[in-house]
């Protein structure tokens, strides 16, 4: 029997199957794009900083004397810097008549030079001496480690903590960089709180390093409610995460994440990573699964799909310090994606195998009033294959995404301090590709993580960027918590297809501005709210559901 609905459904399904690859670039969700939407940008790493107390010896107290002639200054005890470098710091004192206090000031120049160049406990002194022929002797004491003692009260095995401190050895000159790296790597270990003290050693010129490790909570986590979903799989979402710190006593981390909008979207991920050595090298593995059903305007299609991702990675901190950090990671991802339209029995099943090499880092500087920089760069090389002949043929006749692909991604941000209460935040994210990409690899623009004036996943493409400027003002803290107001401007541009295969518009630009309010309350409650409206003309290919878009996130950590 003839029913008018069937031709309509067939036309809608054909449109859905090809829309993600067309020049319009508007995103009708599938397994690939939804998988990207539910994974927000990774926040900057903020590990617990170790507590370090330094107990210094007081300055040498020598009796005052009358001025005397200084013809030459001799220096001894230095090994980190050559004598000529240190002598240049005090050479202007030669050929003058100086008091002992003035000689101490000359020695302090060398002390400060050592401190500025990573030797926090080194000092130069004018020892008791008999001045003959105007020759004054300045002695450099390059502080060395005496005892290095570890008092482990955490649940991490002693051998792993000992290996992390192994680069620091008795009789070794104390340098700030080496000490910072070892103590920060200790503090990076899940389940560990680090307290360290440097005390004067028993031998002259030595300091003992006493390190105490205490346990941190065995489990941490949080729950969050937001409206960050898209209109096809449900806007309101509830998510949660649970981390088991040091679950097997080897500095390991077991993480569980879930996210759901009800029956239309369900996502779960389990990940485990552990330390391989005392230098912060980590090996990790993860498995995630996703199931979706399209509703709203596309409910009649009975469209649904799944995604499964298996990941393996190896990471290494190359630089670890309070003011600069650099991490490297190599990751392998195997993704299986399934998009089905049951009404027309259309199936698009595919898989990808990809390798990702990435560098991530941060720096703190004193430019203007000071700021924090975060950056990351990654290169992905992969292979896409289809699991059914019909989907493979459709791809070959259109976007031709099957086969080898590669892409570059970059993220840059800076938080500039303007005053005690004001800050300026700048960020840029970009992607470049060598060929047409599957939606799971494309750049998505629109939503709370990019251009907030547009719906989640408004446009997508093989290449593009989005950038943000935010002016943040922190209000006076009250017993109700800390409030922060935000004014922002977002803009993004997408090139839909690297290799154009269909006539029509192949790019889109989205811009918008808005205001926001952030709240950090007691008991680790946080709220983030943004309201934004588009600027300029909205691309015709982008669906519009109103001129104002609002985003809300409510979270509770424990």
Q: Which functions belong to the PLM regions below?
A:
Residues 4, 24-229, 241, 258-266, ...:
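Periplasmic polypeptide-binding modules associated with outer-membrane biogenesis and secretion
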Residues 194, 219-221, 248-254, 278-283, ...:
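Repeated loop/turn-to-beta-strand initiation elements of outer-membrane beta-barrel proteins
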Residues 205, 234-238, 264-268, 306-310, ...:
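Residues that define the transmembrane beta-barrel architecture of outer-membrane proteins
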Residues 219-229, 240, 250-262, 268-270, ...:
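Transmembrane beta-strand segments that form the barrel wall of outer-membrane beta-barrel proteins
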Residues 221-223, 242, 254-258, 283-287, ...:
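Membrane-embedded beta-strand positions of outer-membrane beta-barrel proteins
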Residues 227-229, 246, 258-262, 287-293, ...:
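Transmembrane beta-strands of outer-membrane beta-barrel pores
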Residues 275, 282-439:
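Transmembrane beta-strand segments of outer-membrane beta-barrel domains in Gram-negative
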Residues 396-558:
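C-terminal transmembrane beta-barrel domains of outer membrane proteins
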């Amino acid at each position: 029997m003839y029913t008018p609905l069937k031709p309509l459904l067939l036309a809608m399904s054909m449109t859905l199957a090809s829309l993600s690859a067309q020049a319009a670039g508007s995103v009708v969700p599938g397994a690939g794009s939804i998988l990207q939407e539910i994974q927000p940008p990774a926040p900057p790493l903020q590990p617990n900083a170790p507590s370090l107390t330094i107990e210094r010896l007081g300055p040498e107290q020598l009796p005052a004397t009358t001025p005397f002639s200084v013809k030459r200054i001799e220096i001894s005890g230095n090994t980190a810097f050559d004598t000529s470098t240190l002598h240049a710091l005090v050479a202007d004192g030669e050929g003058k008549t100086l008091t002992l206090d003035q000689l101490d000031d000359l020695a302090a120049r060398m002390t400060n030079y050592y401190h500025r160049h990573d030797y926090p406990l080194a000092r130069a002194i004018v020892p008791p001496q008999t001045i003959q022929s105007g020759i004054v002797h300045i002695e450099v004491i390059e502080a060395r480690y005496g005892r290095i003692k570890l008092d482990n009260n955490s649940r991490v095995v002693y051998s792993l903590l000992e290996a992390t401190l192994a680069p620091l050895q008795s009789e070794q000159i104390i340098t700030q960089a080496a000490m910072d790296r070892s103590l920060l790597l200790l503090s990076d270990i899940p389940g560990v709180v680090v307290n360290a003290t440097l005390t004067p050693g028993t031998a002259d010129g030595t300091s003992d390093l006493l390190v105490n490790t205490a346990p941190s909570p065995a489990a941490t986590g949080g729950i969050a409610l937001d409206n960050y979903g898209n209109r096809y799989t449900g806007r309101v979402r509830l998510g949660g995460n649970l981390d088991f710190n040091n679950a097997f006593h080897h500095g390991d981390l077991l993480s569980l994440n879930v996210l759901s909008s009800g029956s239309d979207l369900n996502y779960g991920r389990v990940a485990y990573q552990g330390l391989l050595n005392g230098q912060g090298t980590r090996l990790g593995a993860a498995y995630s699964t996703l199931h979706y059903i399209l509703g709203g305007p596309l409910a009649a299609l009975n469209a649904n799909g799944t995604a499964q991702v298996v990941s393996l990675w190896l990471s290494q901190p190359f630089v670890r310090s309070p003011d600069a950090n650099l991490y490297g990671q190599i990751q392998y991802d195997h993704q299986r994606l399934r998009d089905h339209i049951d009404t027309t029995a259309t199936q698009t099943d595919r898989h990808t195998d990809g390798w990702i090499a990435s560098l991530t880092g941060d720096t703190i500087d004193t430019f203007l009033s000071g700021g924090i920089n975060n950056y990351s760069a990654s290169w992905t090389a992969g292979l896409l294959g289809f699991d059914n002949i019909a989907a493979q043929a459709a791809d070959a006749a259109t976007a031709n995404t099957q086969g080898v692909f590669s892409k570059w991604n970059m993220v840059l941000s800076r938080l500039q301090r303007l005053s005690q209460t004001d800050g300026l935040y700048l960020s840029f994210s970009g992607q470049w590709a060598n060929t047409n990409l599957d939606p799971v690899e494309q750049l998505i623009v629109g939503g709370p993580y990019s251009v907030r004036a547009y719906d989640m996943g408004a446009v997508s493409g093989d290449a593009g960027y989005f950038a943000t400027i935010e002016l943040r003002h922190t209000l006076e803290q009250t017993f109700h918590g800390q409030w922060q107001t935000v004014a922002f401007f977002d803009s993004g541009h997408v090139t839909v297809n690297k290799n154009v295969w269909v006539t029509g518009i192949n790019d889109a630009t989205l811009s918008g501005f808005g205001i926001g309010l952030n709240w950090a309350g007691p008991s680790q409650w946080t709220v983030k709210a943004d309201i934004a409206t588009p600027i300029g003309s909205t691309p015709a290919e982008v669906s519009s559901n109103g001129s104002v878009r609002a985003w809300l996130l409510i979270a509770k950590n424990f």
